[in-house]
A protein has these predicted regions:
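N-terminal secretory-pathway/extracellular module detecting exported/lumenal segments
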Residues: 22-82, 86-187
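Bacterial N-terminal signal peptides that target proteins for export
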Residues: 1-9
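N-terminal signal peptide c-region/cleavage motif recognized by signal peptidases
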Residues: 17-19
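Hydrophobic helical h-region of N-terminal Sec-dependent signal peptides
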Residues: 9-15
Length: 187
């Protein structure tokens, strides 16, 4: 049984300087499960929903890879988390994490807490719900990005942030319009 973090080590190789034939690159089925968008500080959490990349653990626990893309300067290009999900007890935890930086072409262990959590961290709760409530993904506003290789996923980061920032700006404009209508006197 492979660990998603070990499986995702191939991601670093794909993104490095080693040439890889595109047909042989492992692919995942990626979904945006949580995002926080603001100008220059956007974060997006993606889950690989490919059933072949979701691992069964003892006790009914499932393990899945979650990717954090962080737009802030000085942050790694992305962080890969190995997340265990316990649907029965409505909890999730991180069991491993790696930061990838394309500037230095490095892969380093990232800090994380391995404590079981309920809803304390929205991205972790959404990752749990992605696995435990697959029929509700659209209702939970999870966006399907599609099937792609890890290298394609990493290259899509800038476009993803453009889209998320545009959506955040749109939502703010709509909120301001709604506030303006609320403040108008009734006739």
């Amino acid at each position: 049984m492979r660990s998603p973090v070990k499986h995702l080590l191939s991601l670093a190789l794909l993104l490095g300087t080693l040439p890889v034939h595109a047909d042989n690159a492992p692919k995942g089925d990626y979904w945006v499960v949580h995002h926080q968008a603001s100008l220059g500080k956007s974060k997006a959490y993606l889950v690989d929903g490919d059933p072949g990349n979701i691992y069964e653990r003892p006790g009914g626990v499932k393990s899945v890879g979650v990717y954090l893309f962080d737009q802030q300067p000085g942050k790694p290009d992305f962080t890969v988390y190995d997340v265990e999900v316990d649907c029965k007890n409505k909890r999730a935890r991180v069991t491993g994490a790696l930061d990838f930086s394309s500037v230095a072409n490095t892969l380093r262990k990232a800090k994380f807490s391995n404590q079981w959590q309920g809803d304390q961290q929205p991205w972790l709760a959404q990752s749990r719900d992605f696995i435990c409530k697959p029929a509700e993904r659209q209702a939970l506003k999870m966006e399907h990005l599609g099937v792609m290789s890890a290298s394609e996923l990493s290259r899509s980061g800038p476009q993803l942030f453009e889209l998320l920032t545009r959506e955040a700006q749109r939502a703010e404009i709509i909120r301001q319009i709604d506030d303006a209508f609320t403040q108008m006197p009734a006739k």
